[in-house]
Amino acid sequence: MKGLFIRIVLAICLSLWAIDMVFPWQQIVRSKQNYHTTIQERQKLIVGTINNPVSYFIGTNGETGLEYELSKAFANYLNVDLEMFPLNSADALFQALAQGKIDIAAASLFYQQDRSEKFKLGPAYHAASWQLTYRKGERRPITLENLSGKLVIPANSALNNILLAKKEKYPSLTWETSELSQEELLFQVAEGKIDYTIATSTEVSVNQQIKPQIAIAFNVTDEFTVHWYLSDKGASELQAALLDFMNSAIENGLIARIEEKYFNHLNQFDYVDTRSYLNAIETVLPKYAPLFEKYKGDLDWHLLAAISYQESHWNPEATSPTGVRGMMMLTKATADRMNITNRLDPEQSIKAGSEYLHLLLKQMPDTILKEDRIWFALAAYNMGLGHLLDVRRLTKQLGGNPDNWLEVKKNLPLLAQKRYFTHLKYGYARGYEAFQYVENIRRYMNSIMNYYRLQQNQQDRYENENNDVISTQTQQEQR
């Protein structure tokens, strides 16, 4: 429902934005050589962003994140290369944009009246609100008026102006600013180091997956639309191209697919499940991570690990009443097909599970988009290839696109309804379980990726601090 609302807002914003910009754009010839002379000459689009688990980060398979995927698609649309230019804050992004160091600022940036007067605004492509957070188990505040502890927000944040306006209604409201990032402040709330912080609803949802102690008190604001920002000087052609691109991204489902990939699974946050899972990541996964890495094949090893957690909670001796066993919960028939002799041996189980999933991937029709193929294959892994073929046929009969995971997955529960399954080749299936199976794996995979990203960030910070100490000692000795 929220995704539909966002897409409706998106379409309205695009229409209003286009109407508002008709006059200056009447003079723009919309051919690719006129999109942006500088970008075309250098054959590169430079996009400024902020390094965080929502917008952009470098994973084991390279660059990823919502803003990266959308920027990459726009660069492809312009037929140029892409360079992501990560900075530490929104202020730094706008400074770089004003100085011409970047072509676009893209970091889940809310609409702000003052900035829209200084920079050109791209179409809205998402929406989020500001939320007050506190540590789970502590007293939940009801309004900004009755905060009993310290509220800390990032320095140079758009929040400062919002809170100044709120202070007129709540004169007792006070807050402090910090040079820490929004993510770091959320972690401090989770660890009880500060009482409250305010973050976007998207940032809160993402970080709850790795710090489940983060709790939401209330929305500080209504939803704001999210935009890209462009330079106010000489960027009309780029702005025109961006409007065309966003229109096509809505029509061909790109925006919906990216939104589903990064946000849909976040709605399933469960405190107890997340705590148990994170504990397993810390204590159990290190033992088996080398095996997931060894047998990942063309997959991301985090995905393979997430599948195994969904199947067995990384218990090599797991056995179900139906006879499936081991880390990847293989049937006897699958084990025989993959030529393994002991399903309870972790290495054999992981190897066979990976090979079987690769086999299913090869059986997916070529018409399915590359980024969606794995989700179709996982549904088949869970309920069988025959039932997947059934739900694809059913989706087509209902007027949907059988190659679009967004459209197919919503029909999975129909496989358990008599009015539908009696007309299907392979009959009844617990499609609702396959739906939840895929959603859980996506959530688990993102949690593993974020956990290891944070571990790497801490290691990098530790090494940098040590290098600074060594450098200082060397300089003192030379004196």
Curated annotation (Swiss-Prot):
The keyword Membrane applies. SUPFAM superfamilies: Lysozyme-like, Periplasmic binding protein-like II. Residues 19-266 are annotated as: Non-LT domain. It comes from the Bacteria. Keywords: Cell outer membrane, Cell wall biogenesis/degradation, Lyase, Membrane, Signal. Its main location: membrane. The active site is at E311. Residues 1-18 form the signal peptide. The keyword Signal applies. One of its GO terms (cellular component) is cell outer membrane. GO terms for biological process: cell wall macromolecule catabolic process; cell wall organization; peptidoglycan catabolic process. GO terms for molecular function: peptidoglycan lytic transglycosylase activity. InterPro entries: Lysozyme-like_dom_sf, MltF, Solute-binding_3/MltF_N, Transglyc_AS, Transglycosylase_SLT_dom_1. It is found in: Cell outer membrane. It catalyses: Exolytic cleavage of the (1->4)-beta-glycosidic linkage between N-acetylmuramic acid (MurNAc) and N-acetylglucosamine (GlcNAc) residues in peptidoglycan, from either the reducing or the non-reducing ends of the peptidoglycan chains, with concomitant formation of a 1,6-anhydrobond in the MurNAc residue. PANTHER family: MEMBRANE-BOUND LYTIC MUREIN TRANSGLYCOSYLASE F (PTHR35936:SF32). In the N-terminal section; belongs to the bacterial solute-binding protein 3 family. The N-terminal domain does not have lytic activity and probably modulates enzymatic activity. The C-terminal domain is the catalytic active domain. This is Membrane-bound lytic murein transglycosylase F. It comes from Histophilus somni (strain 2336) (Haemophilus somnus). The lineage of its organism: Bacteria, Pseudomonadati, Pseudomonadota, Gammaproteobacteria, Pasteurellales.
